[in-house]
Amino acid sequence: MNKEEVRNFVKARILEAGYTMSEVVDVLSSDYGVSDSLSNFSAKLGRGSLRYAEAVKIADILGYDIVWQKRR
């Protein structure tokens, strides 16, 4: 996935879960102590610089598990 595809994928999962990006940022702050502003979070998605640990937390907020599956 390139950075644009990652951004679109994450934003789509946020919307499908019934959240706004602002709400996700708020939950990251209140539940995980992540101090990101909405503009910083959006910029990370745009640059493709979202850290894996942040992606795991976002997945948890949205009700997803990230699963690593060995290719066959």
PLM regions with names:
Residues S30-L50:
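Recognition helix of helix-turn-helix/homeodomain-like DNA-binding domains
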Residues Q69-R72:
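Short amphipathic recognition helices of helix-turn-helix/homeodomain-type DNA-binding modules
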Residues D26, S30, D60:
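Alpha-helical residues within the helix-turn-helix
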